[in-house]
Amino acid sequence: MGGGLLQLVAYGAQDAYITGNPHITFWKVLYKRHTNFAMEAFRVNFTGSPQYGQRVVAIINRNADLMYKTYLEVQLPDTQTVDVKWTSAWERRLGYQLLKKIEVEIGGQIIDTHYGEWLFLWENLTSNFDNSVKLDTMLGGYLGGTETTAVSCGGRPAILYIPLQFWFCRNPGLALPLIALQYHEVRINVTLSPATDLVTAATPGSTTVSAAAALLPQIKDMALYIDYIYLDVDERRRFAQQSHEYLIDQLQFGLQQTLTTANARIDLTLNHPVKELVWVFQDARKTDCGSTLTLNAGFTQPFSYDDIVNRARLQINGQDRFDERYGDYFWKVQPYQHHTGGAFFPMRSQVTAPAALTVLAGSCSVTGDVLTVGADPASGTAPQQLIVEGATVSTTSPGTFAPGTIIQSFGTGSGKQGTYQLSEPSLLTGTTTGLSVIFTLPNLNYTPHENPINVYSFALQPEEHQPSGTCNFSRIDTTTLVFDSIFTAGIAKPTKSTPFNFRMYAVNYNIFRVMSGMGGLAYSN
């Protein structure tokens, strides 16, 4: 008898708890059939043109039956003005920094409000490292150059894709039933950050932030792209005729306060059953473009936070909710215990190539419509762009190419040497003087970077829709966060001369009801 058969017949009373009266088998695939549906993305425009610091509104069209995943698509200016640079937004998360706040309004009632900073915090807590790297490219994580150089879009506009995180965007079972909201209009209200929050002077001190912001070109285009869901006839009829009740997540912006003392008691104003609290401390100089803070290096860091807490505790109605804990417990242990992401944000750093720029007159040449790339061991990879570098290049057509003009982008290739076809050879006179080839740089490094985002969760799994624990702050009179600061190398304590900002967010449950063609919240603040 084989060993496998011995295992099979070694069956006792204890096995009855594991394999007795089985419900599943691993050796036959089972699946469930789903209702018929189709999904299509539609563009929804905002009323008026988007301007920095202004509020714009998008009225959601009833293109289909349900409203699901929603993205804000922003087309940035394709030109830059001298001495005007985009803010770094902590590894250039420009898409989040652009949003001051964004609201869902149904029937004239604000159902939920999110903030650019909250989207950043939520990404850190819920996205794994690989997804954060992908989001980096969607949110303007690398528009060209470094934080202190101008955005270079290669002659075309840079486009930001900002995923929204409202309740109906994250769970298909919570998709917004437009078919059942016949008498209530659905709107998405977006308030953009002022230009002074988005730029800094290229050379600190040479141009004031206000002057730099005044020179910043306006956003070229902005729109929502929404995944609409078409339901089949029977399910569509049920959605239209029946009442609906959804358990949804809401965000509360609990408090924003400036700290000027090392020890503090912060009173929080919260409502509803809350499943987790999220808060941050930040040196106020990090959002002040005019600051002389050394680590600013001439640009702002709105999403860079500080670890200043020695010990902290939460008090509810004057009673300690838990024993006093060290400050790093809230941004190390709590995210590890309750979140799939973490406060270790992927920091992008560019590897410097030994010879990223190779002059054509040296190892490359243009003959007719062919670019020939010669041997250059230092460059290491295929050419990325043919550009004008350092001199004006004449063309066969009227006009000239100024320095910085991109003649052609090649993308990625299989090797550094060889010939490359030029798409517009007639534009060149045959001269090689002043032309350069930009070689693809080595892969950009992504390394974890500690970014202290503090969490306290009342739920076992706060990322899940299924409730797993809450604290009903509507039934609590006072809530206070008590802490004392500790000096950390390179980080000052809160004082009047070096104030710190404190911001608290809370995620709570509420009930969203849809009946008789109208929708609204069951519980208000």
Where do the PLM segments sit?
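Small/polar beta-strand repeat architecture
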Residues: 353-389, 394-442
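Short, low-complexity Pro/Thr/Gly
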Residues: 1-356, 440-525
